């Protein structure tokens, strides 16, 4: 009988392989208004995540999300993939997007980079991974989402409430209408039909500790 640690290690390898074989990751570039090619993405088995967070409105210069894959017992493993939902060169008041291989994902960490330090919202860590975080096991992701081949998925707006050093809450709301309306203007390739599929908040891991990391 396989031990739990062996099953987790095997799950990490499978999760990493699924990302490596399934396609590519992408983030917005303010100069790239023609990509992505949805037909090509569908052929590659990839889709597009469109998302917003409450951090977009809190003076963050960058907002990133650390992705994880589900494993045994409802836990999630950091697979070493981070997507940028807001970048310094992104158009104002526009949701972020990422090109991802089709599949199920969890977000285990949201990071706000702003003057004075980084504000980090992280799910509960069960077992630490490597120095760069790959392989870290979390009790449950903060939110989950699903993408199908060739889909533009409107996954909603993740609302994070609570101050650093306190317990914080996670909820999912609609992306503000004004932001959605700006999306096809900023990025013509995303003018097609979106699949509205809001992220889900798991029953476990929906509240964790927030921390402020000082800038080095």
Model-derived features: where do they sit?
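Tryptophan-paired
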Residues: 72-103
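Alpha-helical interaction segments
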Residues: 14-15, 95-96, 169, 177
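Primarily secretory-pathway and cell-envelope proteins
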Residues: 25-82, 112-216
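Sec-dependent bacterial lipoprotein signal peptides
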Residues: 1-24
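A short tyrosine-centered beta-strand micro-motif
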Residues: 102-110
